[in-house]
Amino acid sequence: MEEPRPSKRLRSMAPNQASGGPPPEPGCCVADPEGSVEADGPAQPAQPAKPIAYVKPFRRQPPARPESPPPAERGRRRGGSRRPGRGRGRRAGPRGDAGQRQGAEGLMAPDVHIQLDHHGEPGHQGEPEITETAAFSLSETGPPPGTVQEGPGPDVAQPELGFQEPPAAPGPQAVDWQPVLTLYPCIGFRALGDSAVLQVIQTPQGTYVQGVPVFLTDIAY
């Protein structure tokens, strides 16, 4: 048979009395270590520590931009050959040939000079003669298109520039050489009460003023 256990109050008082200490005050409760252990229950096992995670450092890099193609080279590159289809080469086709032909015609257009030559005879006025001088480039083998060529072909040597002698007049009045008379514009003025006519003649060498008697001007006109 088991013996009855003393109450918690009696057990708490017993050790104090045995040790000779002062009695506990009334109304004070002393906890029993055994009872506290029984009241708390069995001890729980120790909880493991928190897990440690090892993180590998990662460096973020911006995305690489796509490289743009280099700009197309224009003209002739340094130390290289000219690219095909580019540059200042001669254009092929009818339009390019027509443009070059028009440019050649503009540069090699004939230079026309009109000169009035008067083959004078004593007491007779001849008809003015119109001469045309055409200047062409020596590099051209033929006349430019659209022009009419008169006289010898391109293989014949061109005559040299110089004094041109007029053809001799037919008949007994023919001479070895006849002077060439050139017509210049002339303006005449007659003063009041004067028998002379003041004439102003303009020539390439200058302007001349001379007086001519009235009877000579009447005969001439």
From Swiss-Prot:
<comment type="similarity">
    <text>Belongs to the PRR20 family.</text>
</comment>
<dbReference type="Pfam" id="PF15708">
    <property type="entry name" value="PRR20"/>
</dbReference>
<dbReference type="InterPro" id="IPR031439">
    <property type="entry name" value="PRR20"/>
</dbReference>
<dbReference type="GO" id="GO:0042802">
    <property type="term" value="F:identical protein binding"/>
</dbReference>
<feature type="compositionally biased region" description="Pro residues">
    <location>
        <begin position="63"/>
        <end position="72"/>
    </location>
</feature>
<feature type="compositionally biased region" description="Low complexity">
    <location>
        <begin position="42"/>
        <end position="53"/>
    </location>
</feature>
<feature type="region of interest" description="Disordered">
    <location>
        <begin position="137"/>
        <end position="174"/>
    </location>
</feature>
<feature type="compositionally biased region" description="Basic residues">
    <location>
        <begin position="75"/>
        <end position="93"/>
    </location>
</feature>
<feature type="region of interest" description="Disordered">
    <location>
        <begin position="1"/>
        <end position="103"/>
    </location>
</feature>
<protein>
    <recommendedName>
        <fullName>Proline-rich protein 20D</fullName>
    </recommendedName>
</protein>
